[in-house]
């Protein structure tokens, strides 16, 4: 019975839902608050605290289709990806989980029922393994399910290993929850080489593990003793790629529908025909991990998770380059992936444009150095005396050309060389040491503090309260009392002080007794406790003292306004820039707010203006800011946005501002949006690849910012006006010089009328002021004579006449200019020696000028 990968996923979840399991969404590929994990690599990661008894949920049975990545740290499959049938950087793990609910019998029965009744797998193609001493599991398989004893294989501890070191015994660590497991294998047939589990040929590809059921039934102590857990649990995992291969009648995972669609698409965009090429497998695998890492907020960088992403992208690009790819190709596969992933690709579809852009930019950046780096690498390999490339060269390729060591290793391996990994690590460590020496770091006493107290937060309803001192610490050491001047951390049983979370900074204020005052400068979370950081301002304080808690209400109010403004800003950015915008971080203080978000290019001035307008419009609408507590699923149905990387309880606080913004948030907020008063963006910048930052202020600080901006504009305007005046003066000087030069040029056009010099001319491009200057210059040059100059500007005629003083008894400038003006539809007049006129009939000007000489002949 053929089933697509999407159908297998849906069938699995639906089956376990029918068995009373809660379908839980795949958690982020970025583990929440688990520094031991680089990426989510198993279905149980998000339930770790449930198995450890540290967290209780509303359900005791769960099922998931968890997205996983193994490409860095301990679980690093990168170098094998594309070269084996079942190694991937990205895979989906189908799982069902019991938290102190059902145990072995139900888990085994569920697994068998799903495989044989739902998927219709033939029972004679299945065999199972159990831990050597797990008679209970053996009997369930044999007597309850009916699997023949010869198809149930007992697996013991590894030879020479520690007790319980076995493929069929799971342990979280040296101590803690552990237990046996049973694995289900599928027999691909005699035509494929390989032996049954537990035989020397078990690493062959005939018998493939498809499902592992872990039974957590013991608590292992430091001395090695095993204590039965009061409520044993179940953790199972089945790789969707492996079971899909079986359902689609193929042997290699790369032959299933998901990979075949990606391989064909990659071949098409590259222009390559051989679909069996291993480089196409690499590209098909890598587009999955890269796309979903970006969806979950990881961006290419030179450190941590971002560097792993960059390594995978560059490995894919290099394999495309091997196949002859011209230009950027990798990002073109995102749409194909989103479609083929079916129901699991919905979030990728929503963020498709962002994912494509991140990949394209990274690919183009690497493409500029790939050719040069490959040339240097190939030259180094060509000139090698031995078969090992030195670590210094590997480091140079990494440091200068962005070649991750595993990419260099790939190329070297293809040419049957190895790399000096130890030498590379030495060079890397030297670089890290230089970086460490360049920085100065103090002691983090807070990291060493362990507190058993669980502090109750009562600050949603007020800024004052009373409590008792549960614990006090000075420089990381617990103390029983404090005296004036001591810098310390105080833990209370109950507090109105908000601990920094979700970007909102911690409260400040005072903790008082009749005997002393502790000034709280910051408030932080410390496990389940709330830590008040500060200094003993006066008097003394002892453990167990009853205290009054007083939050700085004015500061708290300012912070709450800015926090509410960040919610409006987030919603406005999504409206203006697109729904790909997600919060990547924030800092909310009393003075201002800072908001980091995903966007691949600088926000334009017009976009920032529109964001500001939208936020201020919502402030003016004065929405009531409503807070409702509901279960997480109801919150999601309501459309509440969740913060990237945040972990939420089953019961969450949903903050709504009209129909404009709905978010999950545990912070302190204003009562109405109108309380914010005014919102003003002060800066926008890029802080990392694909991450932008906006800084802003509200209320009086926003007014101050606007006034400061207005003053700055006024200053710039005054500077511009002064510059304009200076330029105008300089321009006039230049025009005067040009007029003087023009005057000298046209003197040659002067004629004599009855022994008197006369100059009549029409000039292009001269303004009236220039004409007057030119008339004066010409009169001075003539000594004795008559001048009439004309110009045309804006379809109007300008006329200026000049007569030297010795001739004003015979000819008056006003009469001359009036005579000409009347012919061009105008009028004018002036002094006997200088007169000005204008007209509107430009076409009549040439004939009017011709009448000047006859008119003068009659008077001179």
Curated annotation (Swiss-Prot):
GO biological process: alanyl-tRNA aminoacylation; negative regulation of DNA-templated transcription
Enzyme Commission designation: 6.1.1.7
Primary location group: cytoplasm
Residues involved in Zn(2+) binding: 563, 567, 665, 669
Intrachain S-S bonds: none
Keyword Cell membrane: no
Keyword Ribosomal protein among UniProt keywords: no
Gene Ontology cellular component list: cytosol
Co-factor requirement: Zn(2+)
Cofactor, how bound (note): Binds 1 zinc ion per subunit.
Reaction(s) catalysed (UniProt annotation): tRNA(Ala) + L-alanine + ATP = L-alanyl-tRNA(Ala) + AMP + diphosphate
Entries under InterPro entries matching the protein: aa-tRNA-synth_II/BPL/LPL (IPR045864), Ala-tRNA-lgiase_IIc (IPR002318), Ala-tRNA-ligase_IIc_anticod-bd (IPR018162), Ala-tRNA-synth_IIc_core (IPR018165), Ala-tRNA-synth_IIc_N (IPR018164), Ala-tRNA_ligase (IPR050058), Ala_tRNA_ligase_euk/bac (IPR023033), DHHA1_dom (IPR003156)
Pfam families: DHHA1, tRNA-synt_2c, tRNA_SAD
Superkingdom of the source species: Bacteria
Top enzyme class: ligase
Subcellular location: Cytoplasm
Stated role: Catalyzes the attachment of alanine to tRNA(Ala) in a two-step reaction: alanine is first activated by ATP to form Ala-AMP and then transferred to the acceptor end of tRNA(Ala). Also edits incorrectly charged Ser-tRNA(Ala) and Gly-tRNA(Ala) via its editing domain.
Family to which the UniProt record says this protein belongs: Belongs to the class-II aminoacyl-tRNA synthetase family.
The protein, known as: Alanine--tRNA ligase
Organism encoding this protein: Vibrio parahaemolyticus serotype O3:K6 (strain RIMD 2210633)
Chain's gene name: alaS
């Amino acid at each position: 019975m053929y089933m697509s990968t999407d159908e297998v996923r849906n069938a699995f979840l639906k089956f376990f839902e029918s068995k009373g399991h809660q379908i839980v969404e795949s958690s982020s590929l970025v583990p929440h608050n688990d520094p031991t994990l680089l990426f989510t690599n198993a279905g149980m990661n998000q339930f770790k605290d449930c198995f450890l008894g540290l967290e209780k949920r509303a359900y005791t049975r769960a099922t998931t289709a968890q997205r996983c990545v193994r490409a860095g740290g301990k679980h690093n499959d990168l170098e094998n990806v594309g070269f084996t049938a079942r190694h991937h950087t990205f895979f989906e793990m189908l799982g069902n989980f019991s938290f102190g609910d059902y145990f072995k019998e139900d888990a085994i029965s569920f697994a068998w029922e799903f495989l044989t009744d739902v998927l219709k797998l033939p029972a004679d193609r299945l065999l199972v393994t159990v831990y050597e001493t797990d008679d209970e599991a053996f009997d369930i398989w044999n007597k309850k399910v009916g699997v023949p004893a010869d198809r149930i294989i007992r697996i013991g501890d590894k030879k020479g290993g520690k007790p319980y070191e076995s493929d069929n015994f799971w342990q979280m660590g040296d101590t803690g929850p552990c237990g046996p497991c049973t694995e289900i294998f599928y027999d691909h047939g005699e035509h494929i080489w390989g032996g049954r589990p537990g035989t020397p040929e078990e690493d062959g590809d005939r018998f493939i593990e498809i499902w592992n059921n872990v039974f957590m039934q013991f608590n292992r102590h430091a001395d090695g003793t095993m204590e039965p857990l009061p409520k044993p649990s179940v953790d199972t995992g089945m790789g969707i790629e492996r079971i899909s291969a079986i359902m689609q009648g193929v042997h290699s995972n790369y032959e299933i529908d998901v990979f075949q669609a990606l391989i064909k698409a990659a071949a098409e965009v590259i222009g390559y025909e051989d679909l069996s090429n291993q480089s196409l497998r690499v590209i098909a695998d890598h587009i999955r991990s890269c796309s979903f890492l970006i969806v979950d907020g990881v961006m290419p960088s030179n450190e941590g998770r971002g560097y792993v992403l960059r390594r995978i992208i560059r490995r894919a690009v290099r394999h495309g380059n091997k196949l002859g790819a011209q230009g950027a190709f990798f990002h073109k596969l995102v749409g194909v992936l989103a479609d083929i992933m079916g129901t699991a690709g919905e979030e990728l579809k929503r963020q498709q444009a962002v994912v494509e852009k991140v990949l394209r930019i990274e690919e183009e950046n690497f493409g500029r150095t790939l050719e040069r780096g490959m040339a240097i690498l190939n030259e180094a390999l060509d000139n090698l005396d031995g078969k090992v490339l030195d670590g210094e060269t590997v480091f140079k390729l990494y440091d200068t050309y962005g070649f991750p060591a595993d990419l260099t290793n790939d190329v070297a391996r293809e040419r049957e060389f190895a790399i000096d990994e130890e030498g590379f690590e030495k060079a890397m460590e030297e670089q890290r040491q230089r970086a460490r020496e360049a920085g100065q770091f103090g002691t983090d006493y807070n990291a060493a503090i362990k507190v058993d107290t669980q502090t109750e937060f009562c600050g949603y309803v007020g800024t004052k309260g009373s409590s008792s001192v549960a614990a006090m610490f000075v420089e990381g050491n617990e103390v029983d009392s404090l005296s004036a001047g001591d810098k310390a951390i105080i833990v209370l049983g109950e507090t109105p002080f908000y601990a920094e979370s979700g970007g909102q900074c911690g409260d400040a204020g005072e903790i008082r007794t009749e005997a002393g005052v502790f000034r709280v400068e910051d408030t932080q979370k410390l496990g389940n406790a709330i830590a008040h950081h500060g200094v003993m301002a006066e008097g003394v304080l002892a453990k167990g003292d009853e205290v009054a808690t007083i939050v700085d209400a004015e500061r708290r109010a300012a912070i709450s306004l800015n926090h509410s403004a960040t919610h409006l800003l987030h919603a406005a950015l999504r409206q203006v820039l697109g729904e790909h915008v997600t919060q990547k971080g924030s800092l909310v203080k009393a003075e201002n707010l800072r908001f980091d978000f995903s966007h691949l290019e600088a926000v334009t001035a017009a976009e920032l203006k529109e964001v500001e307008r939208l936020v201020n419009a919502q402030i003016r609408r004065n929405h009531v800011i409503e807070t409702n507590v509901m279960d997480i699923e109801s919150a999601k149905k309501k459309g509440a946005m969740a913060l990237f990387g945040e972990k939420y309880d089953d019961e969450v606080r949903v903050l709504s501002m009209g129909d404009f913004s709905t978010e999950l948030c545990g912070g302190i907020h204003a009562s109405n949006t109108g309380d914010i008063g005014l919102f003003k963006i002060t800066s926008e910048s890029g802080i990392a690849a694909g991450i932008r930052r906006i800084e802003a202020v509200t209320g009086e600080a926003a007014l101050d910012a606007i006034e400061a901006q207005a003053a700055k504009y006024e200053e710039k305007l005054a500077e511009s006006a002064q510059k304009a005046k200076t330029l105008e003066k300089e321009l006039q000087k230049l025009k005067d010089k040009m007029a003087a030069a023009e005057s000298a040029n046209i003197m040659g056009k002067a004629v004599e009328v009855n022994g008197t010099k006369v100059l009549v001319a029409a000039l292009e491009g001269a303004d009236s002021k220039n004409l007057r200057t030119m008339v004066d210059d010409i009169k001075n040059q003539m000594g004795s004579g008559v001048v009439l100059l004309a110009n045309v500007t804006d379809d109007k005629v300008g006329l200026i006449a000049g007569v030297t003083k010795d001739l004003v008894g015979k000819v008056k400038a006003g009469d001359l200019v009036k005579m000409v003006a009347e012919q061009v539809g105008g009028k004018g007049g002036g002094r006997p020696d200088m007169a000005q006129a204008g007209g509107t009939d430009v076409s009549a000007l040439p004939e009017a000028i011709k009448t000047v000489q006859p008119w003068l002949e009659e008077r001179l």
